[in-house]
Amino acid sequence: MKKLAILASGTGTNAERITRYFAEKKTVEITLIITNKENAGVIERAERLNVPCMVVSSKDFKEGKALEILKRYEIDFIVLAGFLLRIPDDILHNYPNRIVNIHPSLLPKYGGKGMFGHHVHEAVLAAGDAESGITIHYIDEHYDEGAVILQVKCPVLPDDTPETLASRVHQLEYEHYPVVIEGLL
């Protein structure tokens, strides 16, 4: 059985979708959720889903505590779901091509440090782009520059707001991310 860890900094909607998707699968277990924020909504979701959840501060991430936890739980694959910290080199070296992320734009557009959530959707609308979407990609040492696994597009509508665009992009995330993860295992 493959053991997955989900890393999330926010409310955890993608973490919940992924956990529910794999709940009935016999070959995959969501073993652990890690967050870097003590008040992240993902903590409550993890409790409801009966998945252990640990808070690891940014400082502790940099000092190797997250890697220790991942090894203790014998994690095979790492899924980032709205995780806002850069993954430290020690984790990258121990999990080559076994860490994936989802980004709410068609990378390389609107990627990099500080480009997450509403910031991305506001930038797409400000630029007047005709389409947006999601990018699922491997993680490397740079923000949002790892090898692309899948991109899925959606239209940007004339009356879109950051919220309406985000809603369509989230639906793409929920639909495609768990399936792509399963295909990579």
Annotate each PLM feature.
Residues 1-185:
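One-carbon transfer enzymes
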